[in-house]
């Protein structure tokens, strides 16, 4: 079973074994509007939970994407270079940003599950 967790900064993590797929939530892409550019980290970069991991630019603003977990970037979604709109079309599908090899899987416990994230979004409405 695949587990999805969220941050209050609207990043998501989908865990697949010891690797986490990271991107921004549907709520985040709606707030950004049309995404026009995504700056991805280098493969091999070590990121720390809460540290800057990527940048997403939309017609409205440029926003930092923070690492929801600590780990090493083992893959990036190079499709976003030519098709940044995938973030709008399928943020939790084809619009993923990077894959991290987790250095501290216990950090997952600090993230919100889907139900808790939806409750958090309700407080923003």
Curated annotation (Swiss-Prot):
One Pfam family this sequence matches: GCV_H
InterPro entries: 2-oxoA_DH_lipoyl-BS, Biotin_lipoyl, GCV_H, GCV_H/Fam206, GCV_H_sub, Single_hybrid_motif
Gene Ontology BP term (one): glycine decarboxylation via glycine cleavage system
Cofactor note: Binds 1 lipoyl cofactor covalently.
Cofactor: (R)-lipoate
GO cellular component: cytoplasm; glycine cleavage complex
Top-level taxonomic group: Bacteria
Modified residue annotations for N6-lipoyllysine: 60
Occurrences of domain Lipoyl-binding (ranges): 19-101
Keywords: Lipoyl
Protein family per UniProt: Belongs to the GcvH family.
Function (record text): The glycine cleavage system catalyzes the degradation of glycine. The H protein shuttles the methylamine group of glycine from the P protein to the T protein.
Subunit details: The glycine cleavage system is composed of four proteins: P, T, L and H.
Stated name of the protein: Glycine cleavage system H protein
Species name: Xanthobacter autotrophicus (strain ATCC BAA-1158 / Py2)
């Amino acid at each position: 079973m695949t587990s999805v967790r969220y941050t209050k900064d609207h990043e998501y993590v989908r865990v697949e074994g010891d690797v986490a797929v990271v991107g921004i939530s549907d709520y985040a892409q709606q707030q950004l509007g049309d995404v026009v550019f995504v700056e991805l980290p280098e493969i091999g970069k070590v990121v720390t939970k809460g540290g800057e991991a990527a940048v997403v630019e939309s017609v409205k603003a440029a926003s930092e994407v923070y690492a929801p977990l600590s780990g090493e970037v083992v893959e990036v979604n190079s499709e976003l270079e030519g098709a940044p709109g995938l973030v709008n079309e399928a943020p939790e599908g084809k619009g993923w940003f990077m894959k991290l090899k987790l250095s501290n899987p216990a950090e997952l416990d600090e993230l919100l599950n889907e139900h808790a994230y939806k409750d958090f979004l309700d407080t923003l409405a």
